[in-house]
């Protein structure tokens, strides 16, 4: 008899072009996307095992662009975990993680735990080796401060390009979703 998988829904939000889709692409398909295409809505399903528990993880990729703000709230329904992503080379995306994305997640899905994820971690190393680097990287301590301020369960960084930390992000997110007590009717709901 096959083992029944626990189902979990993960929703990733953040500014457009911050690296959300690349993260999901690398995690589910094992390779970095060759071209950037703005996301409207994409769903992926993958099976994984965390702490000996088989999990069917549904991944919801959302559009960060303003023109999709009216559609995005539908993705929050019954979310078990929210990833808020920002690009480590774009301080404004961290500010938006705190002011826009955390507020939106808490409004539509107040009981879902949040993990704050710094994306494009490889750019930190690249900037370190550039003599005249003009792009200012988000200090890790600033990101940790934002994570605390929004009540995130964890702050993590990863690079979809190199693969560093990608599996760790989803392991922590899945584990966090499993640790949350599920009360009947405690899932996120949307009233329109």
From Swiss-Prot:
- Do you know which Gene3D superfamilies this protein is assigned to? P-loop containing nucleotide triphosphate hydrolases (3.40.50.300)
A Gene Ontology biological process noted in the UniProt record is:
actin filament organization
Keywords assigned: Cell membrane, GTP-binding, Hydrolase, Lipoprotein, Membrane, Methylation, Nucleotide-binding, Palmitate, Prenylation
**Leader sequence residues:** none
State the SUPFAM superfamilies in the record.
Answer: P-loop containing nucleoside triphosphate hydrolases
Xref: InterPro entries:
P-loop_NTPase, Small_GTP-bd, Small_GTPase, Small_GTPase_Rho
Q: Which residues cross the membrane?
A: none
Give all Cysteine methyl ester modified positions. 189
GO CC, sorted alphabetically, is: cell periphery; cytosol; membrane; plasma membrane
Positions of short motif Effector region? 36-44
Which residues are part of the propeptide segment? 190-192
Q: Where is the lipid attached (S-palmitoyl cysteine)?
A: 188
The record places the lipid (S-geranylgeranyl cysteine) at 189
As for subcellular location, the record says:
Cell membrane
Q: Provide the binding site for GTP.
A: 14-21, 61-65, 119-122
**GO: which molecular function terms?**
GTP binding; GTPase activity; protein kinase binding
Membrane topology term: Lipid-anchor
| EC number(s) from the headed UniProt entry | 3.6.5.2
Q: Describe its partners and assembly state.
A: Interacts with BEM4.
- Print the miscellaneous field: Present with 3870 molecules/cell in log phase SD medium.
Give the family this protein belongs to, as stated in its UniProt record: Belongs to the small GTPase superfamily. Rho family.
Protein name as catalogued: GTP-binding protein RHO2
User: Its encoding gene is what?
Assistant: RHO2
């Amino acid at each position: 008899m096959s083992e029944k998988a626990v189902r979990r829904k993960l929703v990733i939000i953040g500014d457009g072009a911050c690296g959300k889709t690349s993260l999901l692409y690398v995690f589910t398909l094992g390779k970095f996307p060759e071209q950037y295409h703005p996301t409207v809505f994409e769903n992926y399903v993958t099976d994984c095992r965390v702490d000996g528990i088989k999990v069917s993880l549904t991944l919801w990729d959302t559009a960060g662009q303003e023109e999709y703000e009216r559609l995005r709230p539908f993705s929050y329904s019954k979310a078990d975990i929210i990833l808020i992503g920002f690009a480590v080379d774009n301080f404004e995306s961290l500010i938006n993680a705190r002011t826009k994305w955390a507020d939106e997640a808490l409004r539509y899905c107040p009981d879902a735990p949040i993990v704050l994820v710094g994306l494009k971690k490889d750019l930190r190393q690249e900037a370190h080796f550039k003599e005249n680097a003009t792009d200012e990287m988000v200090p890790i301590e600033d990101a940790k401060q934002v994570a605390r301020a929004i009540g995130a369960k964890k702050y993590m960084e990863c690079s979809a390009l190199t693969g560093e930390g990608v599996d760790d992000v989803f392991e922590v997110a899945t584990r966090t979703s499993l640790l949350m007590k599920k009360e009947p009717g405690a899932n996120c709901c949307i009233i329109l």
